[in-house]
Amino acid sequence: MASAAMLVPLVLVLCTAAASAAVVEHTFKVGGTKITQLCMNSVIYTANQQLPGPTIEVTEGDTLVVHAVNDSPYPLSLHWHGVYQLRSGWNDGANKITQCPIQPSGNFTYRFNITGQEGTLWWHAHSSLLRATIYGALIIKPRNGPSGYPFPEPYEEIPILLGEWWNRNVDDVENDGYLTGLGPQISDALTINGMPGDQNRCKGSAMYEVEVEYGKTCLLRIINAAVNVELFFKVAGHTFTVVAADASYTKPYATDVIVIAPGQTVDALMNTTASPGRYYMAAHVFDSKTVAVPFDQSTATGIVKYKGVPNYAPAAMPSLPPHDDVVTAGRFYWSLTGLARPSDPGVPTTVDHNMVVTFGLDQAPCAPNQTKCSGFALVAAMNRNSFQFPDQKVSLLEALYKGVPGVYSEDFPDFPPPMQGFRKATAVKKVKYNDVVEVVLQSEQYSSTLGTENHPIHLHGFDFYLLAQGLGRFNPSMKSKYNLVDPQVRNTVAVPAGGWAVIRFMANNPGMWFMHCHLDAHLPLGLAMVFEVLNGPAPNLLPPPPVDHPKCHG
């Protein structure tokens, strides 16, 4: 595995009081890292020679400063997944949306405040498939310490980052996917905290292990950092109580299996009251595609070992659900409810913008430079708009701030247009500050040969209320199913294959905010759109860009 941390975070306390806000400072050097995985030697790109990358811990109200140094050969940006970036949208890290990428040998300092959020988020590269190896946890502690948790204080907190591994350079994987027109090849393994475990053909593969004490309560901070797959996760002989999702508290939900889509996080309490021994934790793919397509069928494993138990003791393996178990997945996703805090204003009841956004995959003619393409290439769209990243030397946010014409159009449709095929466009939906937006997200079968699948839809810049979700087609009568009392609060929703989800949010954050599928195979195909949120009254204004903001190079 990669070496231990190169740098320890420097915490500069601004006030002498223990509970005062602080500046938490890190330096992330992104560069090549030699690693042996699955019996193969590879060079991958990581932050600070670590896989996963460094865990960031802050307290609510702190300011986070990350000096990003790009020693890789690839332009890149870093995204702080789920952080509101209230009036700090220049730091969101969405490539060509809120910033131009940091060029090789370049650097940029991300600086933003984290207020009004607690729980488990994460950070990752937002440039090509580089996020397969450039990612880490971002943990936000309550301002008043563990007593601020709305559940009993855990004895131990354990980050569990689930990922994917390729035996090839991931940039080559992505490029080949473009040349064939069919997207990237499936991964060679799944990982838990960067390690595949022992359930593969490579004898002696690295496996994550955590030691626990009997009779305690652990808080597992579970993150799906995988690039293209939803996952089932279990620990043999143990059950969970889910207490948060996407850094928003939930009412306690008891389960023996976690279902988690790319981009999502789940906080789950686990009591260590099983017979002392060794127990496998395991994860494998949840795949709900309606057309059979190959997927990674490996199982990632780790070990929960009770203190005092010898390392050679046999370990029990959990029974994971079948890969296509939509019943178990639906039960998990649809059973979670939100736990409102006193400061939560509740679900806004007046809606200014009602939208229906369909999305899916379609077929397009091969482009001239897709030299390995045969017959057709994949394309993706939202409301028949296949999103195109701007090719001018400016990000969308800079174009908004400086009034640069011709970079984007403000004509993203509120409803699916009556057309076949798709149009390629950099189209945004413009809303006023504090407008309330409701979006029906509908998984659509654009092509009879491609079918449908689950799509994790992630919204930058906001949390949203998840009012309802279901299978089949949404119709207005389903509004009676809306949960307006205690809905989940999310930043990423797993929209079922051929199904729907309804989200609602208040646009109280000026800027350009990306909404896209968090399956990285689909993002470059165009499964994305942008919300343009106008300035409000002072101080709710988009500030000027940082002086060292990266410049675009076309």
From Swiss-Prot:
Its cofactor is Cu cation. GO terms for biological process: lignin catabolic process. Glycans are attached at N107, N113, N271, N369. Cu cation 1 binds at H79, H458. It catalyses: 4 hydroquinone + O2 = 4 benzosemiquinone + 2 H2O. Transmembrane segments: none annotated. Residues 29-145, 156-309, 411-537 form the Plastocyanin-like domain. It holds the Pfam family Cu-oxidase_2. GO terms for molecular function: copper ion binding; hydroquinone:oxygen oxidoreductase activity; oxidoreductase activity. The keyword Metal-binding applies. Its EC number is 1.10.3.2. Belongs to the multicopper oxidase family. Lignin degradation and detoxification of lignin-derived products. This is Laccase-8. The gene is LAC8.
